[in-house]
Amino acid sequence: DMLLTTFIVIGLYQLYRWEDKLELKGVPIAIPALLGCAVLTKGPVGIILPLFVFGVYLLMLRKYSYLVIFKALLYAGISSIFLPLLWYVAAWKQGGDTFLNVMLAENFGRFFHLSTPDIHYNLGHENGVWYNFMTLAAGFVPWTIFFFFSLFGLKLHKPEKSVKEILASTWNNIRSMEKEKLFSLVALVCIIFFYSIPSSTVSYTHLTL
């Protein structure tokens, strides 16, 4: 799981550099190598999650057309799946339909809340969205405690703007962020959202954050 986190984090960094330095021209070999290795460690999440984060980031930039974004994600995805596909085909030939059923159940069954009769072991904690935030809060102890104590020092003032104006101002501030900060924020939100979808999860899935 630490290995998966390493490949995803470095892969995200390479995706960011691809846009920042090359403006999506060509696909650096490091991207398919890193994402491919991420797939081999933990399954399709190694490609889906980084490209999901990167796609949202590109949309937030409003610098490229939808077609350019789609082509960039498609090229990165196809090139990244080549290496894992060789391993999956070899494993399928060795394990047959049993391997295929278990692989589909582990990677897609719990994500789409489907029944997984071929799995006879625990896939993780079946808790609500709150579990992700509780795990993150526990992981940042003691800083979480200091954060909650600091809330008592806040001075609240009656807002001079309407809720709509506040939301619009917040959105504009996000859009005007430096690219590094915007990418970090998008990654944070997308990863939390992504891991809130599966019907079961485990605490180490938050290592990417």
Regions found by a protein language model. Give the residues of each.
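Generic secondary-structure signature for well-ordered alpha-helical cores
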Residues: 17-21, 38, 138
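Multi-pass, polyprenyl lipid-linked donor-dependent membrane glycosyltransferases
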Residues: 1-10, 25, 41-47
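Transmembrane-lumen/periplasm boundary regions of multi-pass, lipid-linked membrane glycan transferases
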Residues: 34, 41, 46-202
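Alpha-helical transmembrane segments of multi-pass inner-membrane proteins
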Residues: 7-14, 55
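Pocket-edge positions in alpha/beta enzyme catalytic cores
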Residues: 3, 7, 21-22, 121, ...
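The feature captures the transmembrane alpha-helix scaffold of multi-pass secondary transporters
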Residues: 29-33
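Conserved small/polar residues in nucleotide/adenosyl-binding loops
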Residues: 205-209
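Membrane-interface transmembrane helices that cradle and orient dolichyl/undecaprenyl
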Residues: 11-27
